[in-house]
Amino acid sequence: MITLQVGVKVFLKNQDGKYLLVKRSPVKYPNVKGSWDIVGGRIDPGSSLIDNLRREVREETRLEIISEPKLITAQDIIPNAEKHVVRLTYVAETSGEPVLDVEENTEFRFLTIAEISKELDLDKYVAEVIRLGLIN
């Protein structure tokens, strides 16, 4: 039987118009080998998608979302025959500097979309959003 999970992710834009990337911990996420990603995670059933998104941002960065998150895409992630993840990606604004949960992420950077598009060690689903021009 296949398990369905839903994840929420967000391109967090700061006051300078740059987006937050976090480097995933290779200890917690050995399959991604420390690639650069955007903040997010799996939802907790029973609470809204946006509440889950805000929670993930607070847990991973101690930042707050200060604008209404806008859904930009949904992606299917099927890593194996037992799991199907639907990843919903948003864009929203934030302010301040992140304080990382080092068990989740080891580094952060704020970059323009042009800079992100040149990053070689980028999560493939983030790269797809950039390549398709879904965010600018």
Placement of each model-derived feature along the sequence:
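Conserved Nudix-box catalytic region and its N-terminal flanking loop in Nudix hydrolases
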Residues: K18-E59
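Unchanged
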Residues: R42-S67, D76-Y125
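Short connector loops at helix/strand junctions that flank enzyme active sites
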Residues: T3-Q5, K33, I38, I66, ...
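Charged phosphate-binding loop/patch that engages nucleotide di/tri-phosphates or the phosphate backbone
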Residues: Y125-N136
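A structural signal for short, well-ordered beta-strand segments
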Residues: V8-V10, L71, Y90-A92
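Generic short beta-strand segments
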Residues: K23, L71-D76
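Conserved N-terminal beta-strand and adjoining loop/helix that marks the start
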Residues: M1-L20, A74
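Conserved hydrophobic "DFG−1" position in protein kinase catalytic cores
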Residues: L12-K13, L21, A92, F110
